[in-house]
């Protein structure tokens, strides 16, 4: 299977962005914050497919985990995280501190969910001993 130049660039950007330290705390062990770049975020809105909606309806009747919804939510979280990393990279950050997720239902009865991943983009440097 061959890839296009855009696919290769996109893949490289994702690998580069994922190597960025991200923490839910406001410090990175062994590093000091040199510069605050600002709040970065990634937002994704997803809605279930018709098939997922039918399966979800059946699970509501008999109970249990709705695997298709769980997978949809996990993919939405990952995409929001990736978008946040890309946003941080674009503004010159090399780390994100104070990362959080938030999710809410949007669109009333459509079952659509918004996932927000956010944090503070920073430039860090190793602590000199």
Regions found by a protein language model. Name each.
Residues 25-28, 102-106:
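Short, solvent-exposed loop/turn elements at beta->coil junctions and helix N-caps
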Residues 1-52, 94, 111-129:
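N-terminal presequence-like segments and the immediate start of the first folded domain
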Residues 101-102, 126:
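Short, ordered loop/turn segments at secondary-structure junctions
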Residues 40, 45, 53-100:
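Short, well-ordered alpha-helical segments
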